[in-house]
Amino acid sequence: MASDDSVLEYAVAGKPLRGELESGDLYAVIARPHGSLVAISDGLGHGYEAAFASKLAINALTAQAHLALPDLVKHCHQSLLRTRGVALSIASLDCEEETMTWISVGNVAGLLLRVNDAGTLEREHIVMRSGVVGHRLPPLRIATLRLHRDDLLVFATDGIREGFQTDVRPDARPQDAADRILSRHGKSTDDALVLVARWRGRANANAVATRR
């Protein structure tokens, strides 16, 4: 269980391609004023060059996490011009407004899962726009969604097979959900990474993200 001052409880599961020493799929959870930034970077291909590109992307995100999401993607793009590039999805969760704004370049899947007041399961999917951060950016578009307590956010690289979205239980613990997705849907031909985060609502002025 997350601590009482946690606004976001998250967990990750991942693996490099067999035979590789490191993965090109990396993540970041970064504190921002009034919330958190959650990102997954998938370096093109696998191995050292993919990992190098993703490390640069995560470093660029961390250094300029205060920027608006389109500007943050552009900053990462400039930082990666001499690399093979990355696919990148980012979500900014605001505990003041109780909203999530997200953006995607490439094929890192994003899913927001909730049970509404009528008991119906709802799924919102990030719009994945064709492009490569570091090579070619598409027109950058954000989408903003209202957050509700216990909403579940899932990011997954393309090392996870399509269709994993229907295998996520809204009441699952983040670590259990991440492990299940990787185990049941991870490909043997690529790096893979899953991040699952539960929105716990606005706790207090010093709310933080907690990995569990």
Enumerate the predicted regions with their spans.
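Conserved subregion of the PPM/PP2C metallophosphatase catalytic domain
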Residues: 1-38, 44-50, 61-212
